[in-house]
């Protein structure tokens, strides 16, 4: 079996995983809740901007962090939005675990751009 075959198997396993199926179900429900969907989209947009700022080396903006925390507190009051956020987080954790497993498996030789 080739690496590509294994990758296809992994894709199939992910697509059929409980975490991904829960994510899809939560997304379907969110798609039917326009106010909840707008809140989630705004939250993710602002969260992504804050993460990009941190990756660019900028210090954490406490005001933006507090705004995100307040937005999250409002989102969790909407069960549909809350369920989507939680399902998204669970699936993202699965994806992160897989990326780590793959990264660890091929770490040797990948230090070309590492710090010297």
Enumerate the language-model features and the residues they cover.
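Terminal, compositionally biased segments used for targeting/anchoring and flexible tails
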Residues: 1-116
């Amino acid at each position: 079996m080739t690496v590509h075959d294994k990758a296809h198997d992994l894709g199939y396993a992910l697509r059929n995983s409980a975490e991904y199926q829960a994510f899809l179900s939560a997304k379907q429900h969110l798609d039917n809740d326009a106010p909840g969907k707008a809140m989630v989209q705004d939250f993710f947009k602002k969260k992504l901007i804050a993460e990009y700022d941190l990756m660019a080396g900028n210090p954490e903006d406490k005001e933006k962090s507090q705004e995100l925390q307040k937005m999250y507190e409002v989102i969790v009051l909407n069960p549909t939005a809350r369920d989507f956020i939680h399902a998204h987080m669970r699936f993202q954790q699965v994806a992160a675990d897989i990326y780590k497993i793959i990264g660890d498996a091929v770490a040797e030789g990948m230090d070309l751009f590492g710090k010297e």
